[in-house]
């Protein structure tokens, strides 16, 4: 929808994204969301006392205290105990949804300032044993379940997420070569942007423990900028014989968090905040679960229609790179301009910590739009189960 009130982003930060089992593996989703939230509050000069609501997205609920996640984030960063909090889950769209939910609170005048965010520790996803709470028979073989792996299959259609991407490859005639070439581009674009310092304004450095002692993590850990086409071509398809999806052209399993603080126009004036961007509108759509990766197509189209804008108006476009064939299917369907889409690399390079990605994409668009002097940008993601979500922002510089 197009917003009923002026809603502005006054701070947007994210942690570096950690590789699976990497530097962030010992931090809970709550820890990482706290790091991002503290950085956002500081960057936006937002006093915790002015925050009216906390909305944090999280998918896997991987820590023992995850049921308290958003509440604990708020309390840890000094937001008053009287301020409510909610943890939400729209799978891969949860980071975006936190912003959408925050906008809805502001538009309904339930809140004036909202701390939004998304966080995920895929490294901490637990193993579990089901159906033993009420006893087991002698000799029973207990099945240990990897919740991370099983969660990547949509049981309603009995289909792993990667197969939904393979379905799009067939439908849109996308080749393995196309996918590997796009994956290489994602890695190369990330390296160029990172070397130029384009991620600096969005980054919330994290102090981590290593064998060499404590160090400050300021750079994403997952990217492999030295990747070559030859290396990508040698990787075997993961889910389908002669398929297109490999470990090299799919988004990386990773850890990370982001925080975006939004405020009404009245709050911006009252607290003398510096608006970085205006939230123009958003749209959420369902789609066929067997091709869930096409979700950004109806989501972006819907957001543009609701706001009276077109793709030509967009200076930057971000489509979360769940899988290379998924992204390429969206690019084909919308006839996206590659020169302004995922300009600094995406999840194939950076990793895709589920709920963290929407917050990362939003934070990146805010700062990159300002760096380039552009006006409009749209961020989007496909969502497991068959949905898509998109948010349009406008540069206020």
UniProtKB/Swiss-Prot annotation:
Official protein name in the record: 3-ketoacyl-CoA thiolase, mitochondrial
UniProt KW keywords: Acetylation, Acyltransferase, Fatty acid metabolism, Hydrolase, Lipid metabolism, Mitochondrion, Phosphoprotein, Transferase, Transit peptide
One GO term (biological process): negative regulation of mitochondrial outer membrane permeabilization involved in apoptotic signaling pathway
Record's GO cellular component terms: mitochondrion
Organism lineage: Eukaryota, Metazoa, Chordata, Craniata, Vertebrata
Main function: In the production of energy from fats, this is one of the enzymes that catalyzes the last step of the mitochondrial beta-oxidation pathway, an aerobic process breaking down fatty acids into acetyl-CoA. Using free coenzyme A/CoA, catalyzes the thiolytic cleavage of medium- to long-chain unbranched 3-oxoacyl-CoAs into acetyl-CoA and a fatty acyl-CoA shortened by two carbon atoms. Also catalyzes the condensation of two acetyl-CoA molecules into acetoacetyl-CoA and could be involved in the production of ketone bodies. Also displays hydrolase activity on various fatty acyl-CoAs.
PTM annotation (N6-acetyllysine): residues: 25, 137, 143, 171, 191, 209, 234, 241, 269-270, 305, 312, 340, 375
UniProt pathway: Lipid metabolism; fatty acid beta-oxidation
EC number(s) given by UniProt: 2.3.1.16, 2.3.1.9, 3.1.2.-, 3.1.2.1
Pfam families, A to Z: Thiolase_C (PF02803), Thiolase_N (PF00108)
Residues bearing the modification Phosphotyrosine: 127
Organism: Bos taurus
GO function terms (MF aspect): acetyl-CoA C-acetyltransferase activity; acetyl-CoA C-acyltransferase activity; acetyl-CoA hydrolase activity; fatty acyl-CoA hydrolase activity
Subcellular location: Mitochondrion
Primary subcellular site in the record, as a coarse category: mitochondrion
Residue positions where Phosphoserine is found in the record: 121, 140, 310, 333
Binding residue positions for CoA: 224, 227, 251
InterPro entries linked to this entry: Thiolase, Thiolase-like, Thiolase_acyl_enz_int_AS, Thiolase_AS, Thiolase_C, Thiolase_CS, Thiolase_N
